[in-house]
Amino acid sequence: MAELAVRCAGVNLRNPFLLASGVWGESGESLAGAWNAGAGGVITKSIGSVPRPGYPNPTIETYEHWGLLNAMGLPNPGIDEYPREIEIARKAGATVIGSVFAGDPEEFARLAVRMATTGVVALELNLSCPHAQGFGTEVGGTPADVEKVVRAVTRAVTIPVIAKITPNTGDPAGLALAAERGGAAAVSAINTLRAIAIDVRLRRPVLSHGLGGLSGPAIKPVGLACVWQIFEKVSIPVIGVGGISNAQDALEYVMAGARALEVGTQVTFDGVGVFGRLAQDLSHLLDELGFARVEDAVGVAHGAHSVPPD
Amino acid sequence: MRSVVAVTERVVETPSTVTLRFSYPATADPGQFVMLWLPGDDELPMSLSYSDGPSKGVTIKAIGGTTRRAQSIRSGDRVGIRGPYGNHLDTAPKRILVVAGGSGSAALAPAAERARAAGGSVTVALGATQAPELLFKERFRAMGARVEVATDDGSEGTKGFVTVVAERLLATEPFDAVWTCGPEVMMKKVIVAAEGRSVPVFCSMERHMKCALGMCDACALGPYHVCVDGPVFPAQRLANVHDFGSFHRDSSGRRVPL
């Protein structure tokens, strides 16, 4: 059986499959459930400075098994209350990564300091939510903004900092480079693609917020391209996320350059048992293809262009 | 995945509950719920209180702004429906005790009808604050169920909580299954009353919901998600769930006392 354990962003993971932020993750029992089902680690819901109810429903639209559109609006219990949920997950033995969102570098730093005291092994900065005014992409849409936020946080905490960047700009690799300059230990890519659904009978957007973010198998090729381009630009590890539903998807991301992976929408489609299945199937696939360790496959597709890169 | 349907009928059931009827062809099992979308307002999880082929209905209790506005929907107005979601009640048992408080009858009445149609006997312990609030009392009687009533103010039936009626019935008569829906304190008492009587208790649970798909975690209840693991829970699955009867979660995910 191929070795699935990886070291990414200074963190040892028992396998590369992390629960993506925003899926489950509001309650400690759910985080523990994903861990117990075999996730290599769990990333919390993005936590802010104060409790936030999120948008009214509808907050979600689904498309069979190829996609899921959401604009939850960053609901979260706030940093005062959330540590008790992390504690529940940690008591279950989970490797927990704390996701935070804020409106400016100073707030990010304050929040990061508090999240870092909860026992999380690393932070993931949400610089990429496509549908929350004043947060996410709005504070992480340019390389300059990404660098400022990441630098403010890395100066304030000692644990590894992961920057989750948006695919909704022309140059995701530029954002990743900026995160690296700011001191990030890794970048995760991608967050959801900005998207919308319209109800033709009612002549209105389906989601209460109008715009949302698309996830699921539909976005896998886009996520892969982002990881591919980022891997060629940065030297820090890349965490691949976007539409991973089976072991082949996972290995495509790894070969494009991802050292760890996040899984979200597939948890919605298959339940949390997806983690055990992905780990087992990836190990078999690596065996079949002659890799002793998943780390040996990271980025191997690069340098194999049939046409020279431009 | 959503259907937009026109409401075909609006029925005032009690002073605090209103039923909206509509046609929605998806097959539903008794105990399942749908997401009811009020365009421009919000979307709510609602048990199907009527499910007879394509003819469906939901019964809404006024508890907040959106539910109040949902009650004012008129015949001809359009709403969005998605679902049905969740698990369902097994209507095979022969002797069923239904314990319903407040608007709990809405979740259990279609299952009781199904059980009666299959030849089962149904006894209903029905509770409300006062007589006019007894939801579906006549409907239960019309399906051939025996109905035992309790009201907080004594305006009909036993004065006090419906759990007193349920305890008496469980102590004196044999049942093959107990279905309960209503305030969680009530359901907890029903579970206690059935302990040691080797009769399984099934609770229909309610939590704040957003996605209804097992993604967003809004309806987390211990290790479960009410939207996909419920809404029906056998009592033993709730035994170690600390939040049951004590806490729910608000829209931000904060645990708040019930």
Which stretches of residues belong to each language-model region?
Chain B
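Ferredoxin-reductase
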Residues: 1-77
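Structural signal for conserved beta-strand scaffold positions within catalytic alpha/beta enzyme cores
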Residues: 9, 50, 149-151, 203, ...
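Short, charged beta-turn/beta-strand-edge "cap" motif at the junction between a beta-strand
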Residues: 40-42, 83-88, 246
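FNR/FR-type flavoprotein reductase catalytic core
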Residues: 65-210
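Local cysteine-cluster metal-coordination motifs and their immediate loop/turn environment
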Residues: 107, 184-186, 205-233
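Short Fe-S-cluster ligation motifs
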Residues: 222-229, 233-258
